[in-house]
Amino acid sequence: MIKEGNHKKLLETIKTLKKYKKVLFLTCSNRYQKILEKQTPKSTILAKVMAKELDNCKIINVPDLNIHPCEGNVSREDGNRCGIKEALLKDKEKNPSGYHRCWASLHNPDDELWKISKELFESDCVVFFASVRWGSANMFYQKLIERLNWINNRYIPLGESNIIKNIASGFICIGQHDDAEKVCAVQKDCHDYYGFKVDDKLYWYWMAEDIDFDEETLKGYLESYPEFFEEFK
């Protein structure tokens, strides 16, 4: 797993991504709308820079979608009901692959997870971009990965085929201090368990400061953007 950010890393990642036919980028960091008019989250900047160098890449900004929370159907009193055939999203436009089975999609007609799953099953590589908040990947990423639980549950434990075994995965996260490495490692294991074809070269992180969480300063946060641009220029 790559540890420290620099321009060479960016070029290596782009080179790796070019071997795939269709790449899906899922950006998960957010800001208040008026702030977004003036600045972009660092992880999203990386996604946009890389996408410009690829011939067939689609970016979906997850915070822009209306994605309802996971309902926890994997651990109901009447047993694991996640991803069963009865949860099929019966809509050819939203679910052309026929793979999308999620109760929350059925229970919430305005849910937009289908916009991600539809693109996912048409891609051979997906990269998640997230920020680190309180020792974990931020809430928009977490909500997304929980809602995709039905993908894993179809073959563990339902015993069906792994529908993402040919889709490579990556996870790139941005953090202020020491938790970024831990978050990246955990999500790599998570994606492997999900059934993705994990690509080691697409899992890395960037930290603004090589410090412990209790050593952070306001100055360090203020300097994080200039340092980010300096390292990746």
Positions of PLM-derived features:
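N-terminal beta1-alpha1-beta2 submodule of the flavodoxin-like/Rossmannoid cofactor-binding fold
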Residues: 1-130, 134-153, 215-233
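Substrate-binding cleft of secreted/luminal carbohydrate-active enzymes
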Residues: 209
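Short, glycine-/small-residue-rich phosphate/pyrophosphate-handling segment
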Residues: 138-140, 157-203
